[in-house]
Protein backbone atom coordinates (compact mmCIF):
# COMPACT_ATOMS: atom_id res chain seq x y z
CA UNK A 1 0.00 0.00 0.00
CA UNK A 2 1.10 3.52 -0.79
CA UNK A 3 0.11 6.69 1.03
CA UNK A 4 -0.35 10.13 -0.49
CA UNK A 5 2.77 11.14 1.45
CA UNK A 6 4.75 8.85 -0.92
CA UNK A 7 3.57 10.73 -4.03
CA UNK A 8 6.28 11.91 -6.43
CA UNK A 9 6.57 12.30 -10.18
CA UNK A 10 6.87 8.95 -11.93
CA UNK A 11 5.30 6.93 -9.08
CA UNK A 12 2.87 4.27 -10.30
CA UNK A 13 -0.46 3.73 -8.51
CA UNK A 14 -3.56 1.66 -9.23
CA UNK A 15 -7.09 3.07 -9.16
CA UNK A 16 -10.22 1.14 -10.15
CA UNK A 17 -8.07 -1.70 -11.50
CA UNK A 18 -6.13 0.59 -13.88
CA UNK A 19 -2.44 1.53 -13.48
CA UNK A 20 -1.63 5.26 -13.48
CA UNK A 21 1.63 7.19 -13.41
CA UNK A 22 1.82 10.46 -11.47
CA UNK A 23 2.74 13.21 -13.94
CA UNK A 24 2.37 16.14 -11.54
CA UNK A 25 1.11 16.73 -8.00
CA UNK A 26 0.52 19.61 -5.62
CA UNK A 27 0.02 19.39 -1.85
CA UNK A 28 -2.65 21.92 -0.79
CA UNK A 29 -3.33 22.90 2.82
CA UNK A 30 -6.32 25.24 2.93
CA UNK A 31 -6.93 27.52 5.91
CA UNK A 32 -10.07 25.61 6.76
CA UNK A 33 -10.45 21.85 6.45
CA UNK A 34 -8.02 19.02 5.82
CA UNK A 35 -5.07 18.99 3.46
CA UNK A 36 -5.39 17.35 0.05
CA UNK A 37 -3.24 16.50 -2.96
CA UNK A 38 -4.14 17.53 -6.51
CA UNK A 39 -2.64 15.21 -9.10
CA UNK A 40 -2.34 14.77 -12.84
CA UNK A 41 -2.31 11.06 -13.61
CA UNK A 42 -1.45 9.34 -16.89
CA UNK A 43 -3.46 6.21 -17.63
CA UNK A 44 -0.71 3.73 -18.49
CA UNK A 45 -2.98 1.64 -20.73
CA UNK A 46 -4.42 4.28 -23.07
CA UNK A 47 -2.14 7.26 -22.35
CA UNK A 48 -4.90 9.71 -21.33
CA UNK A 49 -4.09 12.25 -18.63
CA UNK A 50 -6.71 12.82 -15.93
CA UNK A 51 -6.82 15.08 -12.88
CA UNK A 52 -7.72 13.66 -9.49
CA UNK A 53 -7.77 14.92 -5.90
CA UNK A 54 -6.83 12.78 -2.90
CA UNK A 55 -7.25 13.48 0.82
CA UNK A 56 -3.96 13.70 2.68
CA UNK A 57 -3.00 10.31 4.12
CA UNK A 58 -5.28 8.36 1.75
CA UNK A 59 -4.01 4.87 0.93
CA UNK A 60 -3.45 3.68 -2.66
CA UNK A 61 -2.73 0.26 -4.15
CA UNK A 62 0.64 -0.32 -5.81
CA UNK A 63 0.06 -1.88 -9.26
CA UNK A 64 1.46 -5.35 -9.97
CA UNK A 65 4.01 -4.33 -12.59
CA UNK A 66 6.65 -6.65 -14.01
CA UNK A 67 9.86 -5.62 -15.77
CA UNK A 68 11.25 -7.95 -18.46
CA UNK A 69 14.33 -7.93 -20.66
CA UNK A 70 13.16 -7.63 -24.26
CA UNK A 71 14.69 -7.20 -27.70
CA UNK A 72 13.07 -5.01 -30.35
CA UNK A 73 12.63 -6.98 -33.58
CA UNK A 74 10.66 -4.93 -36.12
CA UNK A 75 7.66 -2.69 -36.78
CA UNK A 76 4.46 -4.22 -38.17
CA UNK A 77 2.03 -1.47 -39.34
CA UNK A 78 0.99 0.26 -36.06
CA UNK A 79 2.63 -2.30 -33.75
CA UNK A 80 6.17 -2.74 -32.49
CA UNK A 81 7.23 -6.39 -32.12
CA UNK A 82 9.49 -7.41 -29.23
CA UNK A 83 10.99 -10.74 -28.17
CA UNK A 84 11.24 -11.91 -24.56
CA UNK A 85 14.95 -12.64 -23.93
CA UNK A 86 14.14 -15.60 -21.62
CA UNK A 87 11.24 -17.42 -23.29
CA UNK A 88 11.78 -16.13 -26.86
CA UNK A 89 8.03 -15.32 -27.11
CA UNK A 90 7.05 -12.41 -29.32
CA UNK A 91 4.98 -9.56 -27.91
CA UNK A 92 3.27 -6.67 -29.72
CA UNK A 93 3.07 -3.14 -28.32
CA UNK A 94 0.97 -0.48 -30.00
CA UNK A 95 2.37 2.82 -31.25
CA UNK A 96 -0.16 4.64 -29.04
CA UNK A 97 1.24 2.92 -25.94
CA UNK A 98 4.87 3.74 -26.65
CA UNK A 99 4.29 7.25 -27.99
CA UNK A 100 7.46 9.12 -28.98
CA UNK A 101 9.67 6.34 -27.57
CA UNK A 102 8.90 4.23 -30.65
CA UNK A 103 10.93 6.63 -32.78
CA UNK A 104 14.17 5.67 -31.02
CA UNK A 105 13.86 1.91 -31.53
CA UNK A 106 16.41 0.15 -33.76
CA UNK A 107 16.24 -3.49 -34.84
CA UNK A 108 18.03 -5.70 -32.31
CA UNK A 109 17.99 -3.11 -29.50
CA UNK A 110 17.80 -4.64 -26.02
CA UNK A 111 15.69 -2.87 -23.39
CA UNK A 112 13.41 -3.35 -20.38
CA UNK A 113 9.64 -3.53 -20.89
CA UNK A 114 7.09 -2.79 -18.18
CA UNK A 115 4.18 -5.27 -18.16
CA UNK A 116 0.84 -5.11 -16.33
CA UNK A 117 -1.04 -8.42 -16.13
CA UNK A 118 1.05 -9.70 -19.05
CA UNK A 119 0.27 -6.70 -21.29
CA UNK A 120 3.01 -4.25 -22.37
CA UNK A 121 2.70 -0.75 -20.92
CA UNK A 122 5.98 1.06 -21.41
CA UNK A 123 9.64 0.61 -22.32
CA UNK A 124 12.81 1.91 -20.67
CA UNK A 125 15.11 3.25 -23.37
CA UNK A 126 18.84 3.80 -22.87
CA UNK A 127 19.75 7.43 -22.13
CA UNK A 128 21.02 7.88 -25.70
CA UNK A 129 20.94 6.03 -29.02
CA UNK A 130 23.09 6.23 -32.15
CA UNK A 131 21.05 6.73 -35.33
CA UNK A 132 21.93 7.44 -38.95
CA UNK A 133 20.81 10.65 -40.69
CA UNK A 134 18.52 9.69 -43.57
CA UNK A 135 17.58 13.12 -44.87
CA UNK A 136 18.79 16.68 -44.27
CA UNK A 137 19.93 19.74 -46.18
CA UNK A 138 23.54 19.37 -47.37
CA UNK A 139 26.21 21.08 -45.31
CA UNK A 140 28.18 23.90 -46.90
CA UNK A 141 31.89 24.43 -46.25
CA UNK A 142 32.26 26.99 -43.50
CA UNK A 143 29.02 26.07 -41.71
CA UNK A 144 30.49 26.36 -38.25
CA UNK A 145 28.34 29.15 -36.85
CA UNK A 146 27.87 28.52 -33.17
CA UNK A 147 24.39 27.31 -32.25
CA UNK A 148 22.85 27.25 -35.74
CA UNK A 149 20.78 24.12 -36.44
CA UNK A 150 18.76 22.46 -39.19
CA UNK A 151 16.19 19.63 -39.10
CA UNK A 152 17.37 16.11 -39.95
CA UNK A 153 15.21 13.03 -40.43
CA UNK A 154 16.79 9.92 -38.93
CA UNK A 155 16.63 6.27 -40.05
CA UNK A 156 13.73 5.54 -37.67
CA UNK A 157 11.61 8.41 -39.00
CA UNK A 158 12.01 10.93 -36.17
CA UNK A 159 13.21 14.47 -36.84
CA UNK A 160 15.95 16.06 -34.72
CA UNK A 161 17.58 19.49 -34.92
CA UNK A 162 21.28 19.05 -35.72
CA UNK A 163 24.22 21.43 -36.29
CA UNK A 164 24.76 22.67 -39.85
CA UNK A 165 27.84 20.46 -40.44
CA UNK A 166 25.88 17.17 -40.11
CA UNK A 167 25.31 15.43 -43.47
CA UNK A 168 23.24 12.54 -44.84
CA UNK A 169 24.75 9.21 -43.75
CA UNK A 170 26.36 10.60 -40.58
CA UNK A 171 25.73 8.61 -37.40
CA UNK A 172 24.65 10.86 -34.55
CA UNK A 173 23.98 10.33 -30.85
CA UNK A 174 20.51 11.46 -29.69
CA UNK A 175 19.22 11.92 -26.11
CA UNK A 176 16.10 9.71 -25.82
CA UNK A 177 14.58 11.76 -22.97
CA UNK A 178 14.67 15.16 -24.68
CA UNK A 179 15.20 14.28 -28.35
CA UNK A 180 18.26 16.56 -28.51
CA UNK A 181 21.38 16.05 -30.62
CA UNK A 182 24.36 15.07 -28.43
CA UNK A 183 27.17 14.54 -30.94
CA UNK A 184 28.50 12.63 -33.95
CA UNK A 185 29.70 9.05 -33.70
UniProtKB/Swiss-Prot annotation:
Pfam families: EFP, EFP_N, Elong-fact-P_C. It is found in: Cytoplasm. CDD domains: S1_EF-P_repeat_1 (cd04470), S1_EF-P_repeat_2 (cd05794). Coiled coil: none annotated. InterPro entries: Elong-fact-P_C, NA-bd_OB-fold, Rib_uL2_dom2, Transl_elong_fac_P/YeiP, Transl_elong_KOW-like, Transl_elong_P/YeiP_cen, Transl_elong_P/YeiP_CS, Transl_elongation_fac_P. Pathway: Protein biosynthesis; polypeptide chain elongation. The keyword Nucleotidyltransferase does not apply. GO terms for molecular function: translation elongation factor activity. Gene3D superfamilies: 2.30.30.30, Nucleic acid-binding proteins. Belongs to the elongation factor P family. Keywords: Cytoplasm, Elongation factor, Protein biosynthesis. PANTHER family: ELONGATION FACTOR P, ELONGATION FACTOR P (EF-P) FAMILY PROTEIN. GO terms for biological process: peptide biosynthetic process. This is Elongation factor P. The keyword Translocase does not apply.
